[in-house]
Amino acid sequence: MDQLRQSLLEAPIIEKGDYEYFVHPVSDGVPVLRPELLREIVIKIIRKVEVDNVDKIVTPAAMGIHISTAVSLMTDIPLVVIRKRQYGLEGEVSLSQQTGYAENEMYINDVRDGERVLVLDDVLSTGGTMRAVLDALDQIGAEVVDTVAVIKKAGPNELDESDHDVKTLINVRVTDGTVVIVDSNGDG
């Protein structure tokens, strides 16, 4: 059974202003994240990317952490979390994260020029977070081997015109209070 697809079809919908927002264990931490769903996601990610050529997994805090940790455990690839807190460590790079909902500063540590990275996140919506992360990694000189978002919300995003391709596991949209599956195989 396709746990990810089914869980999205059953996801509660809330309204934030004029925006319909699905509440999902992958993107929000509620309802409860079942281990079989997380396992399915990790297996799909590992099958979709070339993990043999990756030095580090990079993910923005907070909702990419559980997915990236599970992938790290399965592949033995070290994990770097892009934090919202500045530590002032040598080599720390700041980036400005702008989403459809908020704007924040984030900080990358422990990624160096020439390192090959896999970027993972929970959802690709406006593309603001992913664009900022990829631009910062380019600035550092890291080689982005692959980029994966578990769920893509259909519609234009900031990466449509970029040089970076983002693979996804499933593409959805929310219409009239319901999650609609646009592509059950995602992009890439």
Curated annotation (Swiss-Prot):
Keyword tags: Purine salvage, Transferase
Protein name: HGPRTase-like protein 1
CDD domains referenced in this protein's UniProt entry, alphabetically: PRTases_typeI (cd06223)
Entry-linked HAMAP family: Hypx_phosphoribosyltr (MF_01467)
Keyword Transferase on entry: yes
Organism field: Haloquadratum walsbyi (strain DSM 16790 / HBSQ001)
Signal peptide: none
EC number in record: 2.4.2.-
The keyword Ribosomal protein is annotated on this UniProt entry: no
InterPro entries assigned to the protein according to its UniProt record, in alphabetical order: HGPRTase-like (IPR026597), PRibTrfase_dom (IPR000836), PRTase-like (IPR029057), Pur/Pyrimidine_PRTase (IPR050118)
Annotated family: Belongs to the purine/pyrimidine phosphoribosyltransferase family. Archaeal HPRT subfamily.
Function as written in the Swiss-Prot or TrEMBL entry: May catalyze a purine salvage reaction, the substrate is unknown.
GO MF assignments: transferase activity
Organismal lineage: Archaea, Methanobacteriati, Methanobacteriota, Stenosarchaea group, Halobacteria
Biological processes, Gene Ontology terms: purine ribonucleoside salvage
Residue ranges crossing the lipid bilayer per the database entry: none
